[in-house]
Amino acid sequence: MEGSPVVVAPWLLNKVLARGARAGRIVEVEAYDGAKDAASHAYRGLTPRTAIMFGPPGFLYVYFTYGMHWCANVVCGPDGEAAAVLIRALEPLRGIEAMRASRPAARRDTDLCNGPAKLCQALDITGADSGGDLMAPPARRRGGAAAGASVPVRLEDDGTAPPRRPGRGVRIGITVATELPWRFWVAGNPNVSR
């Protein structure tokens, strides 16, 4: 995960994001390249909010948006340089009943995790999880907020390879750097947000 977010993003496709008994396969992501990317939270430098984005890689960066939704990112790139990959959609794999309970508005299982806020609701990911190490035992955490998280969020590799030719296009829901084709997805997967 030490590579650029544009390299790490498609590599994350088909990895599994899990929390307790709930898990989903990552089917859509977006890359954000720190100081080089006007759409990145870290574009203007280090702040208390963006500190986790500066590394080391493999940690979870969770932020609150629109005053109501959490969004989850995987920190990547060299330690000390801000970069992250937004997880945009998951294909539900395990704990689907619990996901349905957390997302009662979802009419179909493909609606449970087909957006960044939806997947955070389905897996109960909040700001308390920001700073959690996605790859290590639960004790390894960065930042103060993660200390309150009871069940760690983790990244799993079940042996499913990333797609050879992922879908690729511009990022969604941003107003700057809109021309960059840094959104990647598993082509044909019905859980992709759009």
Question: Model segments located where?
Answer:
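Conserved, well-structured core segments that form or line functional sites
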Residues: 1-194
